[in-house]
């Protein structure tokens, strides 16, 4: 294949000036063969299995990074939802499993490990309930473990009992990690229609339909797209902007696929998916909000933001799907408040509210992500925010999620500092009117008519 010198220079510019990188190489590992009634034996099986599969993951990605000159920011692992594989154990909680995952993550040198998870969209088994009730302490005593719970799906409806429970779990997680800015909540996400091959944290888990061991890759390129849109000459129409984004997404995706396939080949693992998601960072310019403003919005969150985000999300998918036959995961545009310099600025200047973020989640990749709210926000209000987001996902047959941080002691206008890629989050206002009676009714919101597809 002939590569033009201009293409090489263009790629170097993307990496050096526009923050292009591989955000994550995530190894998915099946733990189904680790089940055992004795918890100590189970934990030993899990630890040995992870080390056997992932012992060369970090070294291999570093070699690939040196070979291609392409930064790989995170190396991660996802495992089979622990609520499924640990249910065979005779134990009151699963905190020891979280400690085992954390120990394996430290030993392999990876950044995060996901899969302390439960899938409860239609109901909870005893194992699901044990895992969910273990989440606050598990996230408080570990450093690298991430947790997720799927509460709803288009086919099953919304498990409102689990939604109500998760409001309390999030509050307790914030309390137990209050001395660290409620960091536990940044490692906990709830889903509707959770994908089984997502490489991004905190929602990554290795689905039961996945291979024994698989490599999934997530690419990051908001800075590249932002530079491309701002570099358009004259007065481009929105159609011109969409075409520009599509072509840029194509280039980004090809690079990610090349890296992912080579990592999988060297590790003798199956190549899974390439997640097209535009994942921002706190760096100036590496921002989804900045792309929306480059289209002509004065500030992200003003009227027109949802339309601009829909254009961006669709163009990224079209360009990426032309570049790879293995597109999966979440694949769209992330709008995490704390991780996006432009979003942070928009919240501080008053153009972006929680309600507008909810509207934006109807057309983008995931949902309400890394949103800080006052520390005294009631559990029922957190559950109601989750229920709204689950409804959007259920009705629209898409993945939606909530990662919300009720940081203890904070009020609207405060800033919660997380550091690193997690950035900092301005505390946003929630409605003062109660939804406690609604949430307290429990039960299940039935699946919509859209579920009847056969």
UniProtKB/Swiss-Prot annotation:
One Pfam family named in its UniProt record: DUF711
InterPro entries assigned: UPF0210
Superkingdom as given in the UniProt entry: Bacteria
Listed Gene3D superfamilies: 3.20.70.20
HAMAP family per the UniProt record, alphabetical: UPF0210
PANTHER family in UniProt: UPF0210 PROTEIN MJ1665, UPF0210 PROTEIN SPR0218
Assembly information from the UniProt record: Homodimer.
Family indicated by similarity: Belongs to the UPF0210 family.
Listed name of the protein: UPF0210 protein Ppro_0613
Organism: Pelobacter propionicus (strain DSM 2379 / NBRC 103807 / OttBd1)
